[in-house]
Design a protein with these regions (language model features):
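Protein kinase-like catalytic domain
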Residues: 55, 105-106, 155
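Short beta-strand
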Residues: 19, 62-66, 112-113
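Conserved kinase catalytic-core helix
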Residues: 82-128, 144
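Conserved structural core of kinase catalytic domains
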Residues: 55, 59-95
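Active-site beta-strand termini and strand-to-loop segments that position acidic
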Residues: 28-31, 74-75, 123
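C-lobe/activation-segment region of protein kinase-like
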Residues: 124-162
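ATP-binding glycine-rich loop module of kinase domains
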Residues: 3-48
Length: 162
């Protein structure tokens, strides 16, 4: 007998895999929701904690439900900022939105005010959304070194800082 684990009645075999990384896998449920399955329960708890903190800010996905090793959250349709900037120029609009995300991270109480460019999505309606918050409380950092390193690798660090 094959044992298939269901998450809130969802069979992952029937869902589209959006991506996988160090923390786990993300599957699309429908046009508005996705499920993130974590390899480690501790990381899942960290992401739940940070998503709860930022539910009132539009830069972060809505959290719908969760379990000990998964979350169901808002599906963010869009393109990662690093991929976007590899084909498009850095504009003042993009800079303003990066700064707005930094301010939002601070206002919701995150300790780590830094983010990788691939964790920022630009939606088709040109909104900027953060898709991964699990490490936001792990260490204290007010200098966005990861963000600046990403911009530097694309040749935009000096433009951003000017």
């Amino acid at each position: 007998m094959i044992n298939i684990k269901l998450y809130e009645g969802l069979n992952l075999k029937h869902l589209t895999l959006l991506g996988q990384g160090y923390q786990g896998k993300v599957y699309k449920i429908n046009s508005s929701k996705c499920i993130k399955i974590f390899k480690k329960r501790e990381v899942c708890f960290d992401e739940i904690e940070t998503l709860v903190m930022c539910q009132k800010d539009s830069h972060f996905p809505k959290l719908y439900s969760f379990g000990e090793d998964y979350i169901i959250r808002e599906y963010i349709d869009g393109i990662e900022l690093d991929k976007y900037l590899s084909k498009n120029k850095l504009t003042s609009y993009i800079c303003e939105n990066i700064i707005a995300i930094y301010k939002a991270m601070n206002s919701v109480g995150f300790k780590r005010l830094d983010i990788a460019l691939f964790h920022i999505f630009i939606t088709p309606s040109n909104n900027f959304k953060v898709i991964d918050t699990a490490r936001a409380m792990k260490k204290e950092s007010i200098y966005p070194s990861i963000l600046l390193k990403g911009l530097d690798s694309l040749g935009y660090k000096d433009d951003f800082l000017s």
